[in-house]
Amino acid sequence: LEFFALIPGSALLIPLILCAALGLLISMTCLSTPSVSLEGKCIWILKSLPLSAQQILRAKLRFHNLLVVPVSMVAGLILALAYGCSPADVVFTVLTCGLLGLLCGLLGMICGLQWARLDWLTEAHPCKQSAALIFTMLGLTAVIVAGGLLYGFALRALLTPTEFLALFCLLLALMCLGLYRAMVTWGARKWEAL
């Protein structure tokens, strides 16, 4: 990132670059994706408990959020402070990283339910070799790339990087709300059908 200091005006882009880099790393921390498939042949144990499908799915999502979201936010905070971002940029970098972690968990739950494989031989299959995991990683990467392309080609003349980060946080929050709604409705029905 020191290279960008040599280009006039590029220091304003550092928060966007930090969010993109951390977002790509967050996309590889899909803890919620294999959580459905890892139940395997013992899924009947969870289904026999007096818990609704929504409670089970929320618990799996909470585990992902407990591990990924705080670490993502702290990483965003440390990097934003280390690179001398403005206070507003620090806030939006931290929020963006947290929302990307949440989006990763929600997208992982949806993909994990859609492409659940309960007939695996070793735990490596759902954790490292599943279609759900690939679609989750590629989906979050696509969101990050689409955000970068949106700013670079359409909104760069209209918005400052800080304003775009605020808009991107809003878009991420809306995506999270939509995916959460899908998880507790469609996802609960899909869980019952497994």
Regions found by a protein language model. Give the residues of each.
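Hydrophobic alpha-helical transmembrane segments of membrane proteins
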Residues: L1-W44, S52-L194
